[in-house]
Every structure is written in C-alpha cells, then in structure tokens.
C-alpha cells in the first residue's frame, strides 16, 4: 500500500523522469514484508504506460502525491536473480524482439534500444555483445536513446548480490568489472536528463551473504554511495500493522477503522487492570493499540525490530510466512481479543512446539551457530 516513504520515493522518481529534479540514483534498503519488490513493481507500472493506469485508490493516491500524471518512460529491469552466470537471460527489445544475452550491460542495452543499443556499446558498431565493461560515455549515450523518442529512462536493478557472488566465485576479475560497471552506470544516469536508476543490492538467498558476499556488497554500496540520494526504506516500523492487515485479511474486514475502537477499549480494560504501566499511558496507549489492531503492538514491535534483523528472515519473507502459519492454526482455538504471542503456541493439550514456532527455533539456531 502507499506508505509515506513509498509515496515520497515514487514522487521523487517520477519528477526526475519528468525532468523536474536531479535525484537520479536511488537505493532501496531492505524492507519488511516484501516492500522492495512492491516498490520496483509500482514504479514500473506507473511510468511504463501511464495512459492505461487503472482507476484504483492506490494509483490515485500516488498521482495526487506526485502532483501530476506520470510521464511515459522506457523501463529496463536488471533482475540479477534471473541472469544466469553462464547462459544469461532472454530479454525483449522495445520493438518486441526477444534475444538471449549474457552480459548485464547487454541486457540493459537491448531493453533500452534493441540492436541499436548493442551497437552503441560495441567497438565495431555491431549488434553483438562485448565482454568488457563499457565506459561511462557509452552508457550515457545508451541512456539517452529513449529521450530522443520523448520518453524518460527508468532503470530498475534488483538482487545484484545474487549474481555478483556467483560470478566472482567463478571469475575473480568480475569483482572489479562489476564495480566499474555500476560506477559508470550511476555516473551516466546522473548526466542524462529524465533518467533515474533505482537499485536494490541485497540478495534474497542468505547463502550469498557469506564473507565474500558481504565484501562484494560493501564494495557495491560504496559505488552507489558516491552518486545516490539518501537510501529509502519504503516500509518502516509505523507501517507494519497496516502491511500485516492487508496481507492477512480481506479489505472489507479492515476497511472501517472506527469499528476497531470498541474492541480496543474492551481489550485495554483487561490489560490496564493488571498492567500499571499501560494504565498510566491513558489515551496514548489507546492510540497505540488502535494503530496496531488487531495485532498487539508489542508483537509487531518484536517482529519488526528483532526477527527481521536475522539474516534468514531478513532476506526472505520468512516472518510473513511464519506468522500466517501461526494465525491459521491459532484461529481454531485462540479466543484472545488481540493477536499476540500466544498465536505461536501449540494447540492446547497438544504436545510439542507448533509448526510456526519450530520454524522460528530453526532460524534462531542457525543465527547462533
């Protein structure tokens, strides 16, 4: 959903693509609940063909925050988890022609300009791949192609570490090659009007985040740091309850916020009777529970600040999956007015740990060892 940070990022990117600011390079921080993926998808849909945007409340909210209709842009996506280190990947040119290419810069060139894009990068002006990293001036020329057709240029980059870790393990020289590519690419994006680059460098697979993976990640972060604006986290702690509500419940069941209050008041009556600290908070406590309803605010706080920091949960949607598993089982027996830690317990009179809790124990054990 359009969180404050997501709306701010979308506004900045769209205005850059309209030629109205100089924020050319944006980097996404890891987010809770798959916010990274939703952010990249949102950006693509808003500018790929804005004339055909559906009339949905979320779309209108984005447009209202931007202050104008998004400009039409050519979007190129470097999805490194789909780019095989040996075979490459199939990509589509602006004219709809498919071709399998191996090098990241070739994948970018084909999406932006087809055969002409490959020719721009090739030493002999051929529609073929080159093995070495293209220089900044060539990438600048490539990024300028959509502008000649009256379009903005949006480059989306995802899962860089997935590819980089594997490629560097095979060929050590690719460590410098990738650094150079991203250095040249980010510098080129800054120089091209109506061009924006939005990147996520992390790997979903925790196995890519070993010592070598962390070294590569740090080096790439340094490269992006030189050109990017402040990093953006589309989903922050204050958004967690809304993310969970939208993931786990039907829109109609959580649409009427006024209906939350009687349940919160009733729950707080029991809580304040035994919890002096909450009782002292008065109206502030009521607002906190309202914002988090139907989840106990302490539960969402722990899930966000503790469990999402663990590597195995951090780079997957593990928290959401485990939480959903717990809710499905607890719905059969838990009569509590709020969704709290009890949902992770096993069914009463059933021995052992619940399936959800077993998953959490496995993750915790992995972190410790």
Segments from the language model and where they lie:
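Walker A/P-loop-proximal flanking segment of P-loop NTPase domains
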Residues: 1-34, 41, 45-47, 219, ...
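P-loop NTPase motor core
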Residues: 4-6, 26-31, 38-127, 133, ...
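Well-ordered, non-membrane alpha-helical segments in soluble/globular domains
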Residues: 9, 101-104, 108, 174-185
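Secondary-structure transition/capping motifs at alpha-helix termini
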Residues: 19-21, 50-54, 145-150, 170-171, ...
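Conserved P-loop NTPase catalytic core
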Residues: 64-89, 94, 98, 102-103, ...
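Mid-core helix/loop region of P-loop NTP-binding domains shared across ATPases and GTPases
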Residues: 118-157, 167-168, 176, 185-188, ...
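Helicase motor interdomain insertion/brace
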Residues: 153, 312-369
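Conserved ATPase-coupling elements of RecA-like P-loop NTPase cores
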Residues: 163-176, 208-210
């Amino acid at each position: 959903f359009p969180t404050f940070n997501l709306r701010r990022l979308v506004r900045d990117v769209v205005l850059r693509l309209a030629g109205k600011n100089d924020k050319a390079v944006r980097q996404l921080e890891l987010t809770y609940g798959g916010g990274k993926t939703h952010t990249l998808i949102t950006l693509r849909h808003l500018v790929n063909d804005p004339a055909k945007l559906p009339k949905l409340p979320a779309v209108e909210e984005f447009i209202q925050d931007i202050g104008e209709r998004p400009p039409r842009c050519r979007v190129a996506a470097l999805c490194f988890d789909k780019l095989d280190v040996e075979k490459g990947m199939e990509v589509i040119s602006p004219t709809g022609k498919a071709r399998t290419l191996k090098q990241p810069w070739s994948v970018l060139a084909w999406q932006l300009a087809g055969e002409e894009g490959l020719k721009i990068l090739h030493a002999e002006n051929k529609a073929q791949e080159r093995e070495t990293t293209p220089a900044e001036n060539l990438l600048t020329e490539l990024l300028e192609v959509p502008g000649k057709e009256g379009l903005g240029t949006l480059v989306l980059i995802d899962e860089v570490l997935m590819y980089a870790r594997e490629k560097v393990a095979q060929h050590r020289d690719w460590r410098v090659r990738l650094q150079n590519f991203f250095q040249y690419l980010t510098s080129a994006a800054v120089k091209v009007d109506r061009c924006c680059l939005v990147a996520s460098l992390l790997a979903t697979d925790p196995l890519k985040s070993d010592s070598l993976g962390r070294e590569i990640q740090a080096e790439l972060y340094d490269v992006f740091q030189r050109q990017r604006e402040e990093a953006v986290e589309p989903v922050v702690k204050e958004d967690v309850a809304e993310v969970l509500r939208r993931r786990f419940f039907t829109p109609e069941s959580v649409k009427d916020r006024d209906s939350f209050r009687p349940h919160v008041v009733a729950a707080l009556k029991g809580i304040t009777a035994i919890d002096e600290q909450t009782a002292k908070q008065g109206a502030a406590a009521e607002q906190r529970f309202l914002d988090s309803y139907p989840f106990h605010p302490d539960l969402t706080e722990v899930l966000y600040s503790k469990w999402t920091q663990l590597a195995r949960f951090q780079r997957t949607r593990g928290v959401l999956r485990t939480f959903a598993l717990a809710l499905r089982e607890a719905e059969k027996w838990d009569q509590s007015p709020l969704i709290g830690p009890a949902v992770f317990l096993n069914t009463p009179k059933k021995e052992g740990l619940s399936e959800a809790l077993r998953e959490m124990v496995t993750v915790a054990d992995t972190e410790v060892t």
